């Protein structure tokens, strides 16, 4: 690895759910608390920003960039003036059926990378469970 300490955590998981089912769960931001409670306790539509999320009583604008044809959904928020960051999620066709879901998260300076990795693994497992039940 070059460039010092890692700045992101990326994991993937295989599922029997088709790409369309995974993207359907991801494209509905109100479902984020079901599978990613570490990110948001609640997400609601906001006429100004599109979406507003709440975590531990703090509200933040959330931009959801979805490309259903490409199987991508990104959840973005302002991390510094003029800069966005967040979760970058891809669902691709798995040979033989189902899909492979990959998510990349930024590593926060005050959070142990092992904790981020464990949270991401739980989130992916819950996400694919929801997609399989769709």
Please place each PLM-identified region on the residue numbering.
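Beta-strand/loop substructures that line and gate deep hydrophobic ligand-binding cavities in soluble
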Residues: 76-134
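Hydrophobic ligand-binding cavity/cleft-lining segments
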Residues: 1-44
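Short, intrinsically disordered, mixed-charge
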Residues: 24-37, 70, 122-133
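Hydrophobic pocket/interface hotspot
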Residues: 22-26, 32, 51, 64, ...
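Short, surface-exposed coil-to-beta transition loops
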Residues: 8-10, 57-61, 83-88
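Generic structural detector for well-ordered beta-strands
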Residues: 12-16, 63, 90-92
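Short strand-connecting beta-turns/loops that link adjacent beta-strands
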Residues: 18, 56, 69, 94-98
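Short, hydrophobic/aromatic-rich segments at coil-to-beta transitions
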Residues: 45-52, 68-76
């Amino acid at each position: 690895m070059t460039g010092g300490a890692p700045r992101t955590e990326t994991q993937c998981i295989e599922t029997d759910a088709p790409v369309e089912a995974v993207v359907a769960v991801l494209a509905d931001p109100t479902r984020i608390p079901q599978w990613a409670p570490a990110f948001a306790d609640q997400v609601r539509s906001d006429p100004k920003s599109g979406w507003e999320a709440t975590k531990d009583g703090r509200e933040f604008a959330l931009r959801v960039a979805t490309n259903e044809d490409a199987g991508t959904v990104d959840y973005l928020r302002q991390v510094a003036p003029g800069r966005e960051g967040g979760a970058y999620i891809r669902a691709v066709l798995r040979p033989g059926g189902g899909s492979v879901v990959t998510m990349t998260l930024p590593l926060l300076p005050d959070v142990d990378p092992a904790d981020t990795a464990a949270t991401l693994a739980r989130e992916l497992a819950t996400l694919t469970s929801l997609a399989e039940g769709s």
